[in-house]
Amino acid sequence: MSTLLIALIALIVLLIIILVVFLYYKKQQPPKKVCKVDKDCGSREHCVRGTCSSLSCLDAVKMDKRDVKMDSKISSCKFTPNFYHFTDTAAEQEFGKTWHSIKITPSPGESHTSQEICERYCLWGTDDCTGWEYFGDEKNGTCNIYNNPYLALKYTKDHVLYLPRNHKYA
């Protein structure tokens, strides 16, 4: 009987030690910093879904865009202030169920690139833009402005695709 009592006391002491160590460890982890833009974060960190993170761009896209389906050939992207920027990437047809195409030919005196014009179309006071892609050269091209939140990205040469960061459809 006394060995059973000693074993029970030892088990209780062990559980208390594990609980104290667990609570101490949780207390030592710094809280995640809340953010709205990258400038709110430290160097080498980006604002992803409202918290500062050191995730790679592709991992950030997978976290920010919940159900993203990405072609395995897509190996990188980069952060821009309002978008995730992909090169050699286009939207699968089901992503563009609801989209409109805009032919871009900047005037000679225009100081903005065709891609900057596409970005402005997407940011023009609407939350409905879930992404845009540009294909063409520096002078002439086409913007596809998407307003449907289905995400499926494919590898395609000479396309540039942008997905809004920290977006309501994420």
From Swiss-Prot:
Virion surface side: 25-170
Residues annotated as transmembrane: 4-24
GO cellular component: host cell plasma membrane; membrane; virion membrane
Membrane topology per record: Single-pass membrane protein
Keyword Calcium: no
UniProt family annotation: Belongs to the asfivirus inner membrane protein p22 family.
Protein's recorded name: Inner membrane protein p22
Protein species of origin: African swine fever virus (isolate Tick/Malawi/Lil 20-1/1983) (ASFV)
